[in-house]
Amino acid sequence: MIFIVVKFPIRPDKLDEWERAREEHTRGARSEDGCLFFDYSQSVDDPNEYVLVEAFRDDDAAVHHVNSQAFKDFVERMPDIVSGHPQIINAKIDQDGFGPMGEISPRQS
């Protein structure tokens, strides 16, 4: 699995444009074969920072995403929306998705 986390610093006056770009990018990515998950969240410390957590089945699926029209359109829009360089973690993980967390289980009634 290719696991990616990206932090996007967004210009406060561009939040509406960011929301549109983010929604279109998400729709496109989630429709791609090999996309395991693709989720954005807003930072609890900085309302102008958003974090993308995404994963792809393998290298081919990740390359397909980067070559997709949705990704290209998103990248083209970003220079006017971001306030700094997005920061990325990109790692290959020997898993194929989520598994159960051993430390927490639902309490039985």
What role is predicted for each listed range?
Residues 1-2, 10-16, 48-52, 89, ...:
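A broad, low-specificity signal for short, low-complexity segments enriched in glycine/proline
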Residues 2-9, 39-66:
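Short, well-ordered beta-strand segments in beta-rich or mixed alpha/beta enzyme
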Residues 2-40:
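N-terminal first-folded block
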Residues 24-37, 55-90:
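An amphipathic, aromatic/His-enriched active-site/gating alpha helix that lines ligand/cofactor pockets
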Residues 40-48, 76-109:
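Glycine-rich beta-strand-turn "strand-cap" elements at beta-sheet edges
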